[in-house]
């Protein structure tokens, strides 16, 4: 009984919780860039990993409209967005992965600046892309 209880407590302590709608809204509001973008080019690199694959995505997109922009982006600007998607057989519970964008697709994107300053990164995990 004690062993079962200890195992249960250990299992519960390692669960990744999904993020709440309030937390998603807060992250969207705090994103440095809230832009409507059109994917002009989508480059994908797939790497096999244990239990699945890692998909590195580089998107070159044109800014269609600006909700807000700390960098001063304006319609017509070209931005680069870099992100990864883990496509694994048994994903842990959590915020979920972003979806792969398609060339020509227009979406509202919540983004932050990457540390290399060469591209933007997702600000809200799997909730960074929304219908415009």
Q: How would you describe each model-predicted region?
A:
Residues 3-13:
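Sec-dependent N-terminal signal peptides
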Residues 11, 15-132:
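Transition segments tied to proteolytic processing and entry into folded domains
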